[in-house]
Amino acid sequence: MRSELISVITVCYNASKEIEKTISSVASQTYKNIEYIVIDGGSTDGSKGIIEEYNKNIDYWVSEPDGGIYPAMNKGTSHAHGDYCIYMNSGDTFYSKDVLQKVVDSNPKEDIVCGDLCICDNIIPNPDEVTMKVFYRSTLYHQATFIRTALIKTYPYDESMRSAADWKFLMHSLIFHNASYRHINIPIAVFEGGGLSDNSSSIGNKEVEEELQRCLPKRILEDYRDYCYGVTPFRQMVNKVEGIPPVRKIIYNTNRIVLKVLNMKLHSQWIKDL
C-alpha cells in the first residue's frame, strides 16, 4: 500500500496572511501522489489571488460563499478521491517535506491514522490508544489525523455545529462505530494559530457537553467526569464557581496563559498517562 492517494484539504476565508505558507508546504512534499483541494469561502482580502498563483499545484479549488468551516470541509471532502483525507487549514503546515512519504511508508491500513503535532516547538503526541476518556477531556488533532475518505463521506461533519463537529465525528467514529485506529510516532504538522476566540471556545464546550448528554446516559456521563477529573473538595468548588459567567471567563483565560507559558507540556503529560 505504498501508492496511497492522499487528499489534502485546505479551507480558508480571508486568510491572505496564512494561506500561501500552507499551500507552499503541501506543494513542497516529496511524496507526489497527492490530491490537493482548496475551499475558499469567498474571501475579499486577496486570498483568491494567492490561490490562483498556485493553480498548477492545486487539483481543485473554488472561491464562493459557504456556511462556515464545516460546510467548507464537507465540500472539500465531496471532491476528494484519495484513500485518506487530511485537513490542513490556512496557517497549518507540514512538519517536514517528507512527512507524507513517511506516513505512506508506515503502510496505513486503519480507518483513522494519527501522527503527532508540533505546537510552540514542542511535539505533542496523539494517544496510542483511544477510549472515551480521550474525547471527554480533549480530542485528536485534525492537522495530524488521516481519515479514510470512505469513512468521512459516510459520516460527514455535522454542519449544525459551529466549533465541535470534528470532535463529534472522531468520537462517534471511534467509540460508537468502532473504527480502526493507529497512532504513528511521526510529527505531521506545525500548528501556529492563536486558537479559538473566547466566544468560539465557549460555543465548542457547550456543543460538546450537549452532545455528551445526548449520546450518553446521565449516570455513565457522571462516571466519566469522576474518572477523568476525580471528585475532590477543590473540584467541587471549581464546579460551583464555573457556573458564574465572569468567573468562568477568568478561569478560561488563566488556563490559556498557563498553557502558553508551559508550551503545552501539561497536555503532553496527560497524553502519556492515558
Feature map (PLM): residue ranges:
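Conserved nucleotide-sugar donor-binding catalytic segment
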Residues: 115, 122-211, 216
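Conserved donor NDP-sugar-binding/catalytic core segment of glycosyltransferases
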Residues: 93, 97-125
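Cell-envelope/extracellular polymer assembly enzymes that use nucleotide-activated donors
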Residues: 4-7, 35, 168
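Membrane-proximal basic amphipathic "stem/tether" segments
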Residues: 217-274
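Short aromatic/hydrophobic "clamp" motif used to bind/position activated sugar donors
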Residues: 85
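Glycine-rich, basic loop-to-helix element that forms the pyrophosphate-binding segment
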Residues: 47, 63-80
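A conserved acidic beta->alpha catalytic loop
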Residues: 32, 40-49, 89, 93
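N-proximal low-complexity "stem/linker" segments adjacent to membrane-targeting elements
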Residues: 1-28
